[in-house]
Amino acid sequence: MSERNTFSHPEHTTVLLHEAVQGLALKEQGIYIDGTFGRGGHSRLILSRLSPNGRLIAVDRDPLAIVEAEKIQDPRFQIEHNSFSAIPEICAKYGLTGKVDGILLDLGVSSPQLDDAQRGFSFMKDGPLDMRMDTTKGLSASEWLAQVSERDLAWVLKTFGEERFAKRIAAAIVNYNKSAVEKNEEILNRTLQLAELISSAVPFKDKHKHPATRTFQAIRIFLNSELDELESVLQSALTVLAPQGRLSVISFHSLEDRMVKHFMRKQSRGEDIPKGLPLREEQIQRNRTLKTIGKAIQPSEREIAVNPRSRSAVLRIAEKL
């Protein structure tokens, strides 16, 4: 059985499993953080390569991921029910600030979340319109759509979904809910209900993409503050990581990848220094906090054939200086 199959969960094929873990340049006695436990594919592979003195802290805000993580009975492993933006606080709690040898982040929604209709992430399966990563906190998608203004909704769809028909779709959603309230009927509260409304609002269809794809993505990203969380954890990695500590990040859409790419590029170039200052090369280099490791990595044709959802994945790796 291949390593990829051994460590992936039956319900979830971990994307870029070997590549992301290899990017951490594991030390047998190192301290590592899996910021997105999911169903544990990356965590299990990391644990298999650590000595008895190694340590792995996993983080996830999905209650079902916590249930899965608690099945791992290993003294080197612990799970934290939290967002990965809380990694600095978690490290401070255990006295690990500046001592972590690697952080792995596998962004976006997992296959079990997509495949579970009750989570409300998929426009292909009928379920409650929820979309929260942590179902114990915040507004569901249905609750938020019932109170958001047309203008704000259009902004969310355009900003986080890059949806060209954002205004049309926002108007259709807000008008539907407004009419439902006036008629004392149910507001939008099912995934297929929303998907069908979006399809009817879009003037023409992209034959390669479902009309609801970008809208569902935008609402999910906004409700879960995904880009804010990502920006926070990227910045905190500079403090949490030890010198030569690695940051290995898998993203699944252009907004995430753009943010990761720009962050790593900026930190590897250092601060802009005005021309003409009498500085030596080593003084200029001090402003750099990271160095990028290799080029961006994408799944092989073989991996995409086995797991089509991996097609859009991009892995970027950097090392703290």
UniProtKB/Swiss-Prot annotation:
Key word Protein biosynthesis present in the record? no
Record's GO cellular component terms: cytoplasm
> Pfam family of this protein, just one?
Methyltransf_5
* Residues the entry annotates as binding S-adenosyl-L-methionine: 40-42, 60, 84, 106, 113
Which molecular function GO terms apply here?
rRNA (cytosine-N4-)-methyltransferase activity
Known InterPro entries for this protein?
RsmH, SAM-dep_MeTrfase_MraW_recog, SAM-dependent_MTases_sf
Q: What catalytic activity is recorded? A: cytidine(1402) in 16S rRNA + S-adenosyl-L-methionine = N(4)-methylcytidine(1402) in 16S rRNA + S-adenosyl-L-homocysteine + H(+)
Enzyme class, top EC level, equals transferase
Please list the GO biological process terms of this entry: rRNA base methylation
Q: Which domain of life is it from?
A: Bacteria
Q: Which UniProt keywords apply?
A: Cytoplasm, Methyltransferase, rRNA processing, S-adenosyl-L-methionine, Transferase
Q: Where in the cell is it found?
A: Cytoplasm
Q: What is its EC number?
A: 2.1.1.199
Q: What is its main location?
A: cytoplasm
Q: What does this protein do?
A: Specifically methylates the N4 position of cytidine in position 1402 (C1402) of 16S rRNA.
State the similarity comment: Belongs to the methyltransferase superfamily. RsmH family.
Q: What is this protein called?
A: Ribosomal RNA small subunit methyltransferase H
Identify the species of origin.
Answer: Actinobacillus succinogenes (strain ATCC 55618 / DSM 22257 / CCUG 43843 / 130Z)
UniProt lists the gene as rsmH
